[in-house]
Amino acid sequence: MIEAEEQQPCKTDFYSELPKVELHAHLNGSISSHTMKKLIAQKPDLKIHDQMTVIDKGKKRTLEECFQMFQTIHQLTSSPEDILMVTKDVIKEFADDGVKYLELRSTPRRENATGMTKKTYVESILEGIKQSKQENLDIDVRYLIAVDRRGGPLVAKETVKLAEEFFLSTEGTVLGLDLSGDPTVGQAKDFLEPLLEAKKAGLKLALHLSEIPNQKKETQILLDLLPDRIGHGTFLNSGEGGSLDLVDFVRQHRIPLELCLTSNVKSQTVPSYDQHHFGFWYSIAHPSVICTDDKGVFATHLSQEYQLAAETFNLTQSQVWDLSYESINYIFASDSTRSELRKKWNHLKPRVLHI
């Protein structure tokens, strides 16, 4: 019994010292309250206060309300300068939390009022990544260009074209494409053509799917693309719109899942932490990665997500370490990056695990 207790992760510093990989982080949803205050101060005429952009401890919102929050945040990040500042701050915060490899995702946006184009939007993020690298932060950052379902298939095609251009010109910084946005808007079949085009061009696909119940057909259409990773997959294994067929398909193809506990509980797609689908996928040893989704909006950080998973599902420190180490397998960067990260983890292991 005592041994088991010793194995239980008890100190918060274990989680922050743990080297981590973050694979599901939306840029505009990851803005901390510190950065948000700076943005709000620059735009007093908008009359936005920081309580409009965060869901504090113990609070919940509907999924619809969460998407409305993003609209509010977009009003604050309307210029290339805003995007650059936000990118640098978000990267620094992830690095401070022990994240060694980060894939940020964001939808290119045009803002006529400031003259920001979709291209300058992407370039601002890339500049933020570049400047962070020059500051010698201990974090490797990549960018997935996101397709927002609300934009429809024509905008999706434009976004894919942009992603292809940057995929070719950035030497591995732009690695893939994300399909996200309000899951109640649009239909999967409308996005098949642009997504297939992206895949053909060599871009990796991370697709949000099965975020809401009763979407079996929609989910199967997206799964048939054989995405490289699945975002959320909340209802794949549920009686409401999930099915054994879907679970078997995901298992058979070993498609990794990006799982975000606080996000799902606070947006009420999952009733409680102990009912989170991480428990199901982890119990069958399926590739699963703990992620934050929107660390700003949901007032969390990756260390906290690991701690929540460990405490909810009774994971030992060794199991938590393995969960983090195995997440390296599912990054979109090259094999050489994977082996660099594994070296880093192995170097840190004796210090973090206190073996």
Swiss-Prot record:
The protein's assembly and partners: Monomer.
Chain segments annotated as transmembrane: none
Q: Does the keyword NAD apply?
A: no
Q: Does the UniProt entry include the keyword Isomerase?
A: no
Q: Which reaction does it catalyse?
A: N(6)-methyl-AMP + H2O + H(+) = IMP + methylamine
> Upper lineage ranks?
Eukaryota, Metazoa, Chordata, Craniata, Vertebrata
Function, as annotated, reads:
Catalyzes the hydrolysis of the free cytosolic methylated adenosine nucleotide N(6)-methyl-AMP (N6-mAMP) to produce inositol monophosphate (IMP) and methylamine. Is required for the catabolism of cytosolic N6-mAMP, which is derived from the degradation of mRNA containing N6-methylated adenine (m6A). Catalyzes the removal of different alkyl groups not only from N6-substituted purine or 2-aminopurine nucleoside monophosphates but also from O6-substituted compounds in vitro.
Q: Which SUPFAM superfamilies match?
A: Metallo-dependent hydrolases
Q: What family is reported?
A: Belongs to the metallo-dependent hydrolases superfamily. Adenosine and AMP deaminases family.
Q: Where is this site: Important for catalytic activity?
A: 232
Q: Name one GO cellular component term.
A: cytosol
For activity, the cofactor(s) needed are: Zn(2+)
UniProt cross-references to PANTHER family, sorted A to Z: ADENOSINE DEAMINASE, ADENOSINE DEAMINASE-LIKE PROTEIN
Q: Which GO terms describe its biological process?
A: adenosine catabolic process; inosine biosynthetic process; nucleotide metabolic process; response to alcohol
Q: Name one GO molecular function term.
A: adenosine deaminase activity
Q: Which Pfam families match?
A: A_deaminase
Q: Which residues bind Zn(2+)?
A: 24, 26, 208, 293
CDD domains named among the record's database cross-references: ADA_AMPD
- Active site annotation, chain numbering: 211
What is this protein identified as?
N6-Methyl-AMP deaminase
Q: How is the cofactor bound?
A: Binds 1 zinc ion per subunit.
Protein residues bound to N(6)-methyl-AMP: 26, 28, 74, 106-109, 148, 181, 211, 293-294
Keywords of the record, alphabetical order, are: Hydrolase, Metal-binding, Nucleotide metabolism, Zinc
